[in-house]
Amino acid sequence: MTAPSQVLKIRRPDDWHVHLRDGDMLKTVVPYTSEIYGRAIVMPNLASPITTVDAAIAYRQRILNAVPAGHDFTPLMTCYLTDSLDADELERGFHEGVFTAAKLYPANATTNSSHGVTSVDAIMPVLERMEKLGMPLLVHGEVTHADVDIFDREARFIDTVMEPLRQRLTTLKVVFEHITTKDAAQYVRDGNDYLAATITPQHLMFNRNDMLVGGIRPHLYCLPILKRNIHQQALRELVASGFTRAFLGTDSAPHSRHRKETSCGCAGCFNAPSALGSYAAVFEEMNALAHFEAFCSLNGPQFYGLPVNAGWVELVRDEQQIPGNIALADDSLVPFLAGETIRWSVKK
């Protein structure tokens, strides 16, 4: 029997879905991402969403100002799609290298999404322009109708929004973000080269029982919400198969402790401190470490048409305890897996 590996050396990874927030929160969380990842797709859902080139440039600079000396990190900015977005502004941002992609939030699907798209038809001219440009569309794939059960919103989105959209715009590059269901896993697997998916560590590690049995665990509450075990297993099998159109997207989404531990808590897991080690643990459990580097470091650049990162990262089998909280101005952040021990950690 071969002894388990003690070191994993991979090409420096990228995070293809992260929330860095703004202000004091941004200054606190950016270093956890910039230390490990060469690039990150930064979500545009600030309180005032990023809908113009100038706003994206200013936000990018605030991010870069928060990157510690010695970290080689490039934030990749995204445009928040709204019903009234100017297609010319989007094209200008793409050509000038400011916007890497555009994000479709169905209105009121998640944090700061009230400005989101009310219907795909409302933004069809923008999407047609994106198809011509080869600009990726990043999709939060849930319907938000009040009569649809929260656990069914992703599957319903595939049938009523995603598939009709892709039938209409056959060469539009689409990233189905943070997929959570066997329906989405199969849909992406069956798709063509214009369709890819990101998957979070929490959706690979946990299911809704982990969040709800024996007490509510608010720090596992995110959107899309954790699903049944059968869906978790489908996601694990997808990544373990070496499927090349699935890649790392943490959806790290920090909220202060008092906004999570409350009678109406916010959705999001702040997983940046432990995500890479968490992914490694899942791949090891699935006997799929041979596919770990591709998921973290190769598949995303291939889909986006970008070069892989030049540097390397080493993970070591060295148990580390995740801190119970992280200081944040006059509050604190509770990270994903707070107080728990993970068996893979990034070598400093």
Curated annotation (Swiss-Prot):
Pathway: Pyrimidine metabolism; UMP biosynthesis via de novo pathway; (S)-dihydroorotate from bicarbonate: step 3/3
Assigned keywords, A-Z: Hydrolase, Metal-binding, Pyrimidine biosynthesis, Zinc
Cofactor note text: Binds 2 Zn(2+) ions per subunit.
Active site positions: D251
Cofactor annotation: Zn(2+)
Entry keyword annotation includes Repressor: no
Domain of life: Bacteria
GO molecular function terms listed in the Swiss-Prot or TrEMBL record: dihydroorotase activity; zinc ion binding
Binding residue positions for Zn(2+) 2: K103, H140, H178
Reactions catalysed: (S)-dihydroorotate + H2O = N-carbamoyl-L-aspartate + H(+)
One GO cellular component, as annotated: cytosol
EC number: 3.5.2.3
UniProt subunit comment: Homodimer.
Protein name: Dihydroorotase
Organism of this sequence: Salmonella heidelberg (strain SL476)
Gene name per UniProt: pyrC
